[in-house]
A protein has these predicted regions:
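N-terminal intrinsically disordered, acidic low-complexity segments at the extreme N-terminus
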Residues: 3-17
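Lumenal/extracellular "mature" regions of secretory-pathway glycan-modifying transferases
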Residues: 2-4, 20-271, 276, 287, ...
Length: 446
C-alpha cells in the first residue's frame, strides 16, 4: 500500500512537473539560443579584431616626404592633351576637365552613387585611384594614413581618392596633387540619424538594451541612458558627419571649437553637396570640375525599401536634431553656402540643367533597367548585382539589368548599376578582409 501511495504521489507530481516543464522549456531554449548567439558573436568579434590587428598596416611615425607633382596623370601629357570641355558658365569659353579629386565619402548620404560616378569617370579616362588595402574602406573608424593605401610608396601620384575614411587632412594632402579638388556631401541631420540608426544599430552594442518595436524613438526619449561615448561603434549614432570629417563628435555643441572646425571644413573643401538637393549638387560638381553632363548621369544606388523607413514626426525629428546638434550646425552652415553657389550659378540655368540631367537619367532608366525601378534583394536575378546589406536584414534595394540592350549602351548600363564592392573588385582592389566577412555572414545567415 505504501509503495502504491508513493507511486500515486510520484505520478501526481510528474503531471504537475510536465506542465511546468512545458512552460519552462521554450524559455530555456530561448536563453540557450541567446547565449549561443552571444558567445558566437563575441568569438567572431574577437576574431575580426585580431584579424584587423594583423591586417592593418603598421603605424609609420616617420615616412620619407617626397612631393607629388602639381597634377597626376596615368599616361603621358594627359592633363595637357585632355579634350577641352564647353564651360558650364555659359559664356562660350572652354576649359580642361579636372582630373585630381578627393571625395570625402560620408556615411548614409548617397555617397555610393557619387562613388559610381567617380569610378566611371576614372576608368573611362584611365586615371589612377588611391584604393584601400584589403577592405573597401581606409580602416575606418581609424584616422586615414597614407600607409592604408594599396601598394603605397612615398611620392606616388594619384588622381582620385574616394573610399570611406575618417578624414585626416594633413595625411590626405600629402597624397594628392596641389590642384586637387576636395568635395564632400552632407544630409539633413534628422533623416541622416534615422538612416544611420537603421543601418548600424545592430553593430552598436549599447542599442541591444533597447526594447519595443521602435528602438530609435525609444533611444531618442533619453539618449544618455543608453549612449556610451567610448562604446564600440558608438560614433555611428551621434554626430556621425562631424566624426567622419575627422572631429570629436562628443564635444559640447556650444563649444567655440565647433564653429572653428566648421570654418576649417569650408576652407579645405571646394564643394560641399547636399543630399536633399542631389541633382543641383551634381550640376555644381560638373561646373567645378568642368565635366560633361554625361559624366554625372546616375542611378540611385543603395536605396532602402519603404517598409524599413521610420516616420519622423515633428517630435522625433526635433529630438534627432537636438541629439545631433553639431551635425545640425554643420548642415545649416553649408546649406547657406550651397545656395550662394546656386545663386552665383544662376537660377534659370540651374533649373534648365537639372531638367536636362533628369531627362537623360530617365532615358537611361528605360534603356538599362528591367521593370524601370529598383527591386527587393530577393528579386535580383544576377548575384553580381547584389548590394551589400546591413547586418541582420536585407533592406537595400538593387536592380535587374535588361536582357536586351543596344550595344551602344550595354557597357554603360552595367557600370552604372554595379554595386560598390563589385566595382572595386573589377578595378583591381584587394578586398580579402571584406570578402572574408561576407562569407562569414553568409554562413551564419546574418
Amino acid at each position: 500500500m505504501e509503495s502504491r501511495g508513493i507511486k500515486v504521489r510520484f505520478h501526481s507530481l510528474s503531471g504537475r512537473e510536465s506542465q511546468e516543464m512545458s512552460a519552462v522549456l521554450p524559455m530555456r531554449k530561448n536563453w540557450r539560443s541567446m547565449c549561443k548567439g552571444l558567445v558566437l558573436g563575441t568569438l567572431l568579434t574577437s576574431f575580426m579584431l585580431l584579424l584587423y590587428s594583423y591586417a592593418s598596416p603598421p603605424m609609420q611615425t616617420s615616412m620619407n616626404e617626397i612631393s607629388v607633382p602639381y597634377s597626376c596623370s596615368s599616361y603621358p601629357a594627359q592633363a595637357k592633351n585632355f579634350p577641352h570641355t564647353q564651360s558650364a558658365k555659359g559664356n562660350g569659353s572652354r576649359c580642361l576637365p579636372q582630373l585630381d579629386i578627393m571625395f570625402m565619402k560620408t556615411h548614409k548620404t548617397a555617397s555610393s552613387t557619387i562613388l559610381n560616378i567617380l569610378f566611371r569617370f576614372g576608368e573611362k579616362h584611365r586615371l589612377k585611384f588611391a584604393f584601400p588595402n584589403g577592405r573597401n574602406d581606409f580602416y575606418y573608424p581609424s584616422y586615414f594614413e597614407r600607409s592604408h593605401v594599396q601598394d603605397y610608396r612615398p611620392g606616388m601620384c594619384f588622381n582620385i581618392i574616394c573610399n570611406h575614411m575618417r578624414f585626416q587632412y594633413t595625411e590626405v594632402r600629402k597624397l594628392v596633387p596641389v590642384d586637387t579638388m576636395f568635395i564632400t556631401i552632407l544630409r539633413d541631420p534628422a533623416s541622416h540619424f534615422e538612416s544611420s540608426f537603421h543601418y548600424f544599430f545592430r553593430i552598436v552594442p549599447f542599442t541591444w538594451k533597447l526594447s519595443g518595436e521602435d528602438k530609435m524613438a525609444e533611444f531618442l526619449r533619453d539618449p544618455w541612458r543608453y549612449y556610451d561615448p567610448n562604446g564600440f561603434n558608438a560614433h555611428y549614432l551621434h554626430n556621425l558627419l562631424f566624426f567622419d570629417l575627422g572631429y570629436d563628435n562628443n564635444i559640447n555643441a556650444e563649444s567655440p571649437l565647433v564653429e572653428e572646425h566648421i570654418h576649417e571644413i569650408e576652407e579645405r573643401f571646394d564643394l560641399v553637396m547636399l543630399l536633399e538637393y542631389f541633382d543641383e549638387s551634381l550640376i555644381l560638381l560638373r561646373e567645378l570640375l568642368c565635366w560633361e553632363l554625361e559624366d554625372i548621369l546616375y542611378f540611385k544606388l543603395n536605396a532602402r525599401k519603404d517598409s524599413t523607413l521610420s516616420r519622423l514626426n515633428s517630435n522625433v525629428h526635433e529630438k534627432a536634431i537636438s541629439w545631433n546638434q553639431i551635425d545640425a550646425k554643420l548642415y545649416h552652415h553649408f546649406n547657406v553656402t550651397f545656395w550662394r553657389k546656386v545663386d552665383a550659378y544662376g537660377w534659370d540655368r540651374m533649373q534648365k540643367d537639372v531638367y536636362e540631367l533628369r531627362q537623360k537619367n530617365k532615358m537611361l532608366i528605360k534603356i538599362c533597367i528591367d521593370g524601370g525601378e529598383a527591386v527587393d534583394a530577393s528579386a535580383i536575378q544576377d548575384s553580381s548585382m547584389q548590394p551589400w546589406q546591413p547586418l541582420g536584414v536585407k533592406s537595400i534595394l538593387g536592380y535587374n539589368l535588361k536582357k536586351k540592350i543596344d550595344k551602344k549602351y550595354r557597357k554603360l548600363c552595367r557600370k552604372m548599376l554595379t554595386p560598390e564592392i563589385q566595382y572595386l573588385t573589377e578595378l583591381g582592389v584587394n578586398l580579402w578582409i571584406t570578402n572574408l566577412w561576407r562569407r562569414i555572414r553568409d554562413f551564419l545567415k546574418w
